[in-house]
Amino acid sequence: RVEDIQETVLSHLEETTPGIVIERRRYKTSELAEAVRKGEVEFFLGSSGFFVEMRPYGVRDIGTIVSRSFPDPNQCVAGVIFVRRDRADLKSISDLAGQTAISTDPRNFMTFQIGMGEIKKEGFNPDKFFRRIDFTNSVPTEVVRSVADGRADVGLLRACMLEAIEARNPHWQNLFRVIGEKKGPRADRLGCRYSTDMYPGWTFAVMPHTPPILTRHVAISLLSMRPEDTPSGFAVSFATNYASVN
């Protein structure tokens, strides 16, 4: 879960940098983008897509979150595209053309943009592919609810979100089918259904106005985080293939 990653990283920083006061702030994607533009933060933890989008403002990555299951920082996250299982007419990406879709936020790389990128890879214009796209103001459960209730034909989320929401809402289990579901060792390790290529994971970045000495201490702290020391087995590495995000 995103909350597990955030809590693990921040708690580790607080424990290993006692001389640094860390003020936690939680933002939605659009709010964080505004905070970066205004220089209101020194560091941020965001998706690799968000990091790439913020590069023009001088941000630099100082670590990518990895786990025991996904030690390669270039291949950590994926998207899931899903429909109701009883929609026999929707079995492939091409079948989704002209349908209504729903996701969390148009600027969210993991929940929305990865899925739209997969549609482009299939040869379609993502800007004209769906008849309508609705958004839930960053509430993933409402994406699932809308597809379950038939208010939207297609849902787009980050991989593993669907399973997590189903676990909290058992009446939705076995109600959905994943479009273009990937199979193989990566899928087995992830333990979740997904529809897209994999991309770099959560990225810890520093702003250009942050003092270098402070950045050094934070970077050293991040790199000292070991899977065996964290509840969810997270560590920090460095992604090298942000070209896939573009």
Each predicted region: which residue ranges?
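Extracytoplasmic small-molecule ligand-binding "clamshell" domains
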Residues: 1-53, 57
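Short beta-strand->loop
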Residues: 59-74, 129-132, 166-198
